[in-house]
Amino acid sequence: IASVDCSDYPKPVCSLEYMPLCGSDSKTYSNKCNFCNAVVDSNGTLTLSHFGKC
């Protein structure tokens, strides 16, 4: 199972690097930072579906 360590998030600003991840909500997040911020916002209910676009 793919996983991402979001322990050092949330962060106030994310870089613009494009390394897409697909969340369990079927949304494509542009990079780990954006994904991890969303994970924190979801109180941990959002998980990684897979790396790459959904």
UniProtKB/Swiss-Prot annotation:
Localization terms from the record: Secreted
Glycosylation sites noted in the Swiss-Prot or TrEMBL record: N43
UniProt site (Reactive bond 3): L16, E17
CDD domains according to UniProt: KAZAL_FS
Pfam families: Kazal_1
Molecular functions per Gene Ontology: serine-type endopeptidase inhibitor activity
Keyword set, alphabetical order: Disulfide bond, Glycoprotein, Protease inhibitor, Repeat, Secreted, Serine protease inhibitor
Disulfide bonds: C6-C36, C14-C33, C22-C54
GO cellular component: extracellular region
InterPro entries attached to this UniProt entry: Bifunctional_prot_inhibitor, Kazal_dom, Kazal_dom_sf, Prot_inh_Kazal-m
Domain Kazal-like: 4-54
Domain notes: Avian ovomucoid consists of three homologous, tandem Kazal family inhibitory domains.
PANTHER family, per database record: OVOMUCOID-LIKE-RELATED, SERINE PEPTIDASE INHIBITOR, KAZAL TYPE 2, TANDEM DUPLICATE 1-RELATED
The protein's name in its UniProt record: Ovomucoid
Organism of provenance: Anhinga novaehollandiae
Species classification: Eukaryota, Metazoa, Chordata, Craniata, Vertebrata
